[in-house]
Amino acid sequence: MKILVIGSGGREHALAWKIAQSARVSEVLVAPGNAGTATEAKCRNVAIKVDDLDGLLALAQREAVALTVVGPEVPLVLGVVDRFHAAGLRIFGPTAKAAQLEGSKAFAKDFLARHGIPTAYYAVHTEVDAALAYVREKGAPIVVKADGLAAGKGVIVAMTLGEAEDAVRDMLSGNAFGDAGARVVIEEFLDGEEASFISMVDGTHALPMATSQDHKRVGDGDTGPNTGGMGAYSPAPVVTPEVHARVMREVVEPTVQGMIADGVPFTGFLYAGLMIDAHGAPKVIEFNVRFGDPETQPVMLRLQSDLVDLVEAAIDGTLDAAQAQWDPRPSLGVVIAAKPYPETPVTGEVITGLDAVPASAKVFHAGTALNAEGQVISAGGRVLCVAALGDSVLDAQRTAYAGLQPIQWASAFQRSDIGWRAIARERDAQA
């Protein structure tokens, strides 16, 4: 069978790589893909943009694609699933209506409140003066979010009142995130530890994937501005078996049932970005309606089951009878980005050393392309993710960082401390 993966990032390379391992799959088409998927076994890139729904549908029909997996949020919010369903094609992802869980922060917060799912207090504002008054009433620290899609970067954690006021003015005067900031969601600053809790959902049932923890800030020690994510590891030790049970009971299952009650059943990857407090109580920071990036890379490294079997079970509504098998070892992925990301990065630089990466590490491509000479060049902010398994998080970290040593280009940089929280936990446990 032929499978289509929509997208061009590290997440899509990891999904395509995993799908290609299925004995049932003859070829994986990736639209538009990157330099990594161009050379991955059984994979072929097709130059169709993720927002070209007509082109994607025509491709799936022309190539007799059996199954489509959607990577990024943009085509989901645009309604790619609705279009494929209307044409009678099998596709894994939420409808445009269900994708509003990510497409609109206000929709998500209203949904959480309506269904009694734990989250931060919040208010939605469109007027600068009212928003400023609310911020002054609540005080800092406080979180200001652009309402629409902002590629994971439309969130300001304001530690002072001045920062909060600046963020409100920026977003509501339309100069920070374009249309996405025409409404802002202002919410409580939550204390605790973050975790990414991703489940596969078939409309009625949820099958949890391995947990993970992302590193949003650009700099070591979680400093500097927010990014799409600078690295991740799996599992997230903050999600103990007890916390896992609470998340399923208090967040995931009520979300699946709430979407049914609201008449928009959810099928796809449901990503709950959580804050776990000192007592193990989860609160939802955000929903995404797709797998995380860079969490997909270390999580796929640990998945031992056939991903195609799981996706088919989800489309058929039989996830309650499915099981996912995981490598018990932790995995860790380090993103190599291009300076001055998250500002507009330098692109078009030739990347060397990819063929010298040891077999103990796996390189997933994100913002890469092939130039006319067939050389791999940088083509985005987050360029590569080097991931590895290990007997401990420290071991996985060492292997991943050793794996990225040979890789070079002029503007490359990465954090040197991915996994630090889990490694500190391991050290404490041994003390």
Swiss-Prot record:
Organism of this sequence: Xanthomonas campestris pv. campestris (strain ATCC 33913 / DSM 3586 / NCPPB 528 / LMG 568 / P 25)
UniProt KW Transmembrane keyword: no
Protein name as annotated: Phosphoribosylamine--glycine ligase
Catalytic activity: 5-phospho-beta-D-ribosylamine + glycine + ATP = N(1)-(5-phospho-beta-D-ribosyl)glycinamide + ADP + phosphate + H(+)
Name of encoding gene: purD
One biological process term in Gene Ontology: purine nucleobase biosynthetic process
Keyword ATP-binding included in the entry's annotation: yes
Alphabetized GO MF terms: ATP binding; metal ion binding; phosphoribosylamine-glycine ligase activity
InterPro entries attached to this UniProt entry: ATP-grasp, ATP_grasp_subdomain_1, PreATP-grasp_dom_sf, PRibGlycinamid_synth_ATP-grasp, PRibGlycinamide_synth, PRibGlycinamide_synth_C-dom, PRibGlycinamide_synth_C_sf, PRibGlycinamide_synth_CS
Residue ranges constituting the ATP-grasp domain according to the UniProt record: 109-316
Annotated S-S bridges: none
This enzyme's EC code(s): 6.3.4.13
Family that this chain belongs to: Belongs to the GARS family.
Pathway named in the protein's UniProt entry: Purine metabolism; IMP biosynthesis via de novo pathway; N(1)-(5-phospho-D-ribosyl)glycinamide from 5-phospho-alpha-D-ribose 1-diphosphate: step 2/2
Cofactor binding, note field: Binds 1 Mg(2+) or Mn(2+) ion per subunit.
